[in-house]
């Protein structure tokens, strides 16, 4: 199945209030901030969105709110994955109801499912989505599910699978997948190797740090498209300096703290068992947020974004 969703797609965080309840006002502001950055698509309800710390009703409400706020301005991919096929089917139906362009699902994890069981799981979700294309989400480091290249080749040929989100540092495998399936849309998942992933054959990326500096990833995407490897490397290094700071503070909490300091969300809260950023890291993040927001404003005034 052909899929045209290429380029830079933000993996959307879920803002919470101080009671760890979903903050829909902040969610809407975050969507608008992505649009300001000239981001054209959102990946909703994935790892960055803390989906596995939410119940099905909450996940469905997020899908509804994002669709409402986006109002046709963005390509929307609904991550509906989880351990339970039945719950994923419910969310796939919701994605169809709210007008999403595609669904996505991580491989079911925790239990040692067979490859055949994984394939059945995906087919059932796809059938529930009533014609929506599927983006398979492969993230072996967190799911614990490690498919061979032959298994990936089989998985992406399931009817209505149109894309693969490949969150892996194995660039050789990424190149092999693209060579074997040139029609498949391939997304790079690790933000820190976005430029390298594009060179290896990715058609775009889905990432969490796009929310705080999406314009940089757009520059990388354009640079690689124009064969300007030096520019792409320069911008990737700039992104990786931010990512290095986030790793030291905790990536998800760090991203939310930056968004909080930038005035985009009302609190930097993640759901338990995630911890808040330690006080010793706050000053560094505050100064980084100021620099990023100033850079965003400059780009906006220069109409770069």
Swiss-Prot record:
Q: Which PROSITE patterns match?
A: DHDPS_1, DHDPS_2
Listed A to Z, the keywords are: Carbohydrate metabolism, Cytoplasm, Lyase, Schiff base
- Lyase: is it a keyword of this entry? yes
Q: Which domain of life is it from?
A: Bacteria
GO term, biological process aspect, one: N-acetylneuraminate catabolic process
Give Gene Ontology CC terms: cytosol
The record's active-site residues are: 137 (proton donor), 165 (schiff-base intermediate with substrate)
Record: residues binding aceneuramate = 47-48, 167, 189, 191-192, 208
Indicate the principal place this protein occupies in or around the cell: cytoplasm
Please give the pathway this protein is involved in: Amino-sugar metabolism; N-acetylneuraminate degradation; D-fructose 6-phosphate from N-acetylneuraminate: step 1/5
Query: What molecular function does GO assign, one term?
Result: N-acetylneuraminate lyase activity
Task: Spell out the subcellular localization from the entry.
Answer: Cytoplasm
Recorded hits in InterPro entries, A to Z, give:
Aldolase_TIM, DapA-like, NanA, Schiff_base-form_aldolases_AS, Schiff_base-form_aldolases_CS
Name the reaction it catalyses.
aceneuramate = aldehydo-N-acetyl-D-mannosamine + pyruvate
- EC numbers: 4.1.3.3
Provide the family line.
Belongs to the DapA family. NanA subfamily.
This chain's function reads:
Catalyzes the reversible aldol cleavage of N-acetylneuraminic acid (sialic acid; Neu5Ac) to form pyruvate and N-acetylmannosamine (ManNAc) via a Schiff base intermediate.
Quaternary assembly: Homotetramer.
State the name under which the record lists this protein. N-acetylneuraminate lyase 2
Species source reads Escherichia coli O6:H1 (strain CFT073 / ATCC 700928 / UPEC)
């Amino acid at each position: 199945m052909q899929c045209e969703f290429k380029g830079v797609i933000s993996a959307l965080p879920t803002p919470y209030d101080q009671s760890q309840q979903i903050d829909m006002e902040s969610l809407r502001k975050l969507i608008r901030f992505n649009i300001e950055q000239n981001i054209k698509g959102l990946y909703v309800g994935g790892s960055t969105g803390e989906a596995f710390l939410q119940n099905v009703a909450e996940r469905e409400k997020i899908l509804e709110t994002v669709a409402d706020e986006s109002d046709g301005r963005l390509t929307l991919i609904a991550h509906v994955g989880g351990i339970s096929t039945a719950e994923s089917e419910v969310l796939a139906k919701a994605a169809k109801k709210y007008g999403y362009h595609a669904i996505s699902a991580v491989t079911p994890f925790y239990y040692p499912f067979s490859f055949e069981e994984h394939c059945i799981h995906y087919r059932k979700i796809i059938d529930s989505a009533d014609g929506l294309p599927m983006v398979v989400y492969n993230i072996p480091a967190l799911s614990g599910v490690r498919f061979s290249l032959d298994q990936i080749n089989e998985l992406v040929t399931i009817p209505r699978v149109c894309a693969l989100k490949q969150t892996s540092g194995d660039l050789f495998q990424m190149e092999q997948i693209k060579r074997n399936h040139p029609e498949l849309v391939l997304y790079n998942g690790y933000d820190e190797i976005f430029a390298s992933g594009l060179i290896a054959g990715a058609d775009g990326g889905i990432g969490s740090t796009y929310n705080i500096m999406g314009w940089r990833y757009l520059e990388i995407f354009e640079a690689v498209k124009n064969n300007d490897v030096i520019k792409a490397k320069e911008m990737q290094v700039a992104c990786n300096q931010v990512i290095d700071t986030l790793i030291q503070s905790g990536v998800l909490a760090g991203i939310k703290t930056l968004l909080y300091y930038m005035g985009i969300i009302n609190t930097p809260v993640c759901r338990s068992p995630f911890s808040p950023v330690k006080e010793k890291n706050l000053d560094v993040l505050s100064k980084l947020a100021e620099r990023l927001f100033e850079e965003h404003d400059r780009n906006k005034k220069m109409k770069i974004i």
